[in-house]
Amino acid sequence: MFDITDEAKVYVADLFAQQDEKDLGLKVDVEKAGTPAAVVTFNFCFPKELSKTYKKFEYEGFYAYIDELNFEYLKDSEVALKDAGTGKKLTITAPNTKGKEPKEDAPLEEKIKYVIAANINPGLASHGGFVELVEITKHMDVILNFGGGCQGCSSVKSTLEQGVEAQLKMSFPEIKSVRDVTDHSNTDNAYI
């Protein structure tokens, strides 16, 4: 599934040797798998805390646990040890984690979701927010719901009109309008 270089194996095994925990393992996850915002994470874990979908991989000096739901995203990946100025750090090259941009003939919904994930949500994430597609009406109105720091934010109207709507209409000229159906009365997590 993925390859760990010999140097990286020695480095990880040494990290485990320094821990005072007998059953500790390395959990490899892909957060937001299949989206442009995907990221691979490495964390210490105890196997008993993992769901049954995690499979065990044995290496000299440690065990890695990977959710079988992430196997396709980690295919052809490589974990290596790289120089990081003051020392070394683990890096992963994972060409399949982010998924692929939809093809030209893909459904409009799929293409809009991709643009939201790839181009819009990374900007909103800097304020702890996100937007998601609710539906596309037969009249080509795009209905969205904001969440996180965008829900209840006093700037959401300008974010919608000048940011999200402008970007979606530029990418998809067939869109007639972009509407927000979020309940903005809840301001508990609002950015401003």
UniProtKB/Swiss-Prot annotation:
GO molecular function: 4 iron, 4 sulfur cluster binding; iron ion binding
Gene Ontology terms describing biological process: iron-sulfur cluster assembly; protein maturation
UniProt remark on cofactor binding: Binds 1 [4Fe-4S] cluster per subunit. The cluster is presumably bound at the interface of two monomers.
Organism domain of life: Bacteria
Cofactor entry: [4Fe-4S] cluster
Residue sites binding [4Fe-4S] cluster per the record: 150, 153
SUPFAM superfamilies referenced in this protein's UniProt entry, alphabetically: Fe-S cluster assembly (FSCA) domain-like, HesB-like domain
Keywords: 4Fe-4S, Iron, Iron-sulfur, Metal-binding
Listed InterPro entries: Fe/S_biogenesis_protein_NfuA, FSCA_dom_sf, HesB-like_dom_sf, NIF_FeS_clus_asmbl_NifU_C
Family designation: Belongs to the NfuA family.
Function: Involved in iron-sulfur cluster biogenesis. Binds a 4Fe-4S cluster, can transfer this cluster to apoproteins, and thereby intervenes in the maturation of Fe/S proteins. Could also act as a scaffold/chaperone for damaged Fe/S proteins.
Subunit record text: Homodimer.
Protein name in the entry: Fe/S biogenesis protein NfuA
Gene that this polypeptide is encoded by: nfuA
